[in-house]
Amino acid sequence: MQHGELVAVTTSIGLHRELTAASKQPTLQHEMKRRVFAAVFNIDKVISTFTGRPPMMSQACSSTSLPLDLSDEALLSGDLLAAAAELDSHGWNKYGRIYSTTILRSRTMFARIRHEILELVQASLDAPSEELVERAMCVFLAEPV
């Protein structure tokens, strides 16, 4: 599958949109949708960075939350609500464990910053704003590991 097709399928099945109610009560379906969307969003920014082309997915048109920092075992255990209750207020696990979703969440947070940088570069602005640099540092410093 080509990247354009991947983005088209992702948006046509609505992975870029999340109902407000979905973000309050985690379910296996919502978490899997978040994981898939985050992975595609990350790929989009990497491809844009290396090809010099504009990103195909707009951050402004997405309402999908980051996936929660849960292990695959916790996600599939059947007691997702209890596992989610063990997370901190930002959705990270409190025990410093590194799961595949930990890396995915982190990459997605940086992909959001990268998206804004790509917009600046594509608009031929000279340098990123101080506010953008400061937010990138905040994301970096807020990493749990």
Where are the language model's segments positioned?
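Extended, hydrophobic alpha-helical segments in both membrane/secreted and soluble proteins
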Residues: 1-11, 36
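C-terminal transactivation domains of fungal Zn(2)-Cys(6)
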Residues: 1, 14-31, 43-145
